[in-house]
């Protein structure tokens, strides 16, 4: 008999033109007095200040993500306004101090805008605090704001969504071979997000209209809900993400060109090949929307790619994927050459 299950998902999701103006109504539901707004460094700081102005009746501090003192516990509500880093730091603060979290994304480059989890790099850095899990109580996605984000970031959001088909296949494999717990519902949600973006990819690829962003945001939020239901990032992060993380770790500070969602899209192609899936279709969609289809296009040489593919399985030994116990260098080279990623 299965044991008791529980999960947390956002209670309130508001998205569309001008959604940011609804922030006071959302905040009012939570009886907060002292509010911390965590922002980015540039344009996102302007949006954070706009939110602070809307909340002028409260005690509000706006702090850049790289200046937040996570040990300071005086706030009873935290808002993450910006892209990945401000939202991740807001999740950390929320987790450490049990402060409710509201996410206000200014871009849509990955599914972190709705998930309870932080990036791999930050989770490793914060490992001494345990697994960082902070499900947003609300997501306010102003599609007018997101439409103004660089189109490359929005296309990276499509890249991140392409990965869901491999992530679910990896999860199914782990369920069959290792007896890992599997949620059909969470997997279906993740795959639905993948299908939504693939079926609309050609129409939305230029992100010239609000409705284009709306499709992307809906799909990314669906992924966040899938992870909340699964109780892990499993339905949305498999071998394709391990490859992306491995590349990012190898490049470190030298990574000046590659965006996470772009790496995920490329990882999806090679992992689909290893799974025996139709990797050419995935690559065709990536090309249609203007995502890179070779590693060279984003400044990654063959040696780094091969090293990443042979070491990716070591990043999360607890997460079984198509990589199994790892690929040898020749097998990795062959996979990357066959898929014409190098």
From Swiss-Prot:
One annotated GO biological process: phospholipid biosynthetic process
Binding site for NAD(+): 84-88, 106-109, 115
Alphabetized Gene3D superfamilies for the sequence: 3.40.50.1970, Dehydroquinate synthase-like - alpha domain
Cofactor binding mode and count: Binds 1 zinc ion per subunit.
Molecular function GO terms recorded: glycerol-1-phosphate dehydrogenase (NAD+) activity; glycerol-1-phosphate dehydrogenase (NADP+) activity; metal ion binding
Protein name: Glycerol-1-phosphate dehydrogenase [NAD(P)+]
Top-level taxonomic group: Archaea
Entry similarity comment: Belongs to the glycerol-1-phosphate dehydrogenase family.
Amino-acid positions noted as binding substrate in the UniProt annotation, renumbered to this chain: 111, 160, 245
Subunit structure: Homodimer.
Keywords of this entry: Cytoplasm, Lipid biosynthesis, Lipid metabolism, Metal-binding, NAD, NADP, Oxidoreductase, Phospholipid biosynthesis, Phospholipid metabolism, Zinc
Source organism of the structure: Pyrobaculum arsenaticum (strain DSM 13514 / JCM 11321 / PZ6)
Higher taxonomy: Archaea, Thermoproteota, Thermoprotei, Thermoproteales, Thermoproteaceae
Stored Pfam families: Fe-ADH_2
Localization per Swiss-Prot or TrEMBL: Cytoplasm
Cofactors, names only: Zn(2+)
């Amino acid at each position: 008999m299965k044991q008791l299950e529980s999960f947390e998902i956002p209670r309130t999701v508001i998205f569309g033109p001008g959604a940011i103006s609804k922030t006071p109504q959302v905040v009012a539901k939570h009886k907060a007095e002292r509010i911390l707004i965590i922002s980015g460094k540039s344009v996102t700081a302007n949006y954070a200040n706009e939110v602070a102005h809307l909340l002028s009746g409260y005690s509000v501090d706006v702090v850049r993500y790289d200046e937040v003192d996570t040990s300071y516990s005086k706030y009873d509500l935290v808002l993450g306004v910006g892209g990945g880093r401000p939202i991740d730091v807001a999740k950390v603060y929320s987790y450490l101090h049990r402060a409710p979290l509201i996410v206000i994304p200014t871009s849509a480059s990955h599914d972190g805008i709705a998930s309870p989890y932080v990036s791999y790099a930050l989770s490793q850095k914060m490992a001494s605090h345990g697994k960082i899990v902070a499900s947003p109580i609300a997501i306010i996605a102003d599609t007018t704001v997101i439409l103004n984000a660089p189109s490359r970031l929005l296309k990276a959001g499509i890249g991140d969504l392409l990965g869901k088909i491999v992530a679910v296949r990896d999860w199914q494999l782990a369920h069959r071979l290792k007896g890992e717990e599997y949620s059909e519902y969470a997997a279906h949600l993740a795959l639905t997000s993948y299908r939504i973006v693939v079926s609309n990819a050609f129409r939305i690829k230029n992100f010239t209209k609000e409705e284009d962003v709306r499709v992307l945001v809906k799909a990314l939020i669906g992924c966040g809900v899938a992870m909340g239901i699964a109780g892990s990032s499993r339905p949305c992060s498999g071998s394709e993400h391990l490859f992306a993380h491995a590349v990012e770790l190898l490049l470190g500070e030298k990574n000046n060109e590659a965006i996470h969602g772009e790496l995920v899209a490329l990882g999806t192609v090679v992992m689909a090949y290893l799974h025996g899936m139709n990797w050419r279709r995935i690559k065709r969609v990536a090309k249609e929307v203007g995502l890179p289809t070779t590693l060279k296009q984003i400044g990654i040489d063959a040696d780094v790619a091969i090293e990443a593919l042979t070491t990716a399985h070591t990043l999360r030994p607890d997460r079984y994927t198509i990589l199994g116990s790892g690929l040898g260098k020749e097998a990795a080279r062959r996979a990357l050459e066959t898929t014409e990623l190098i």
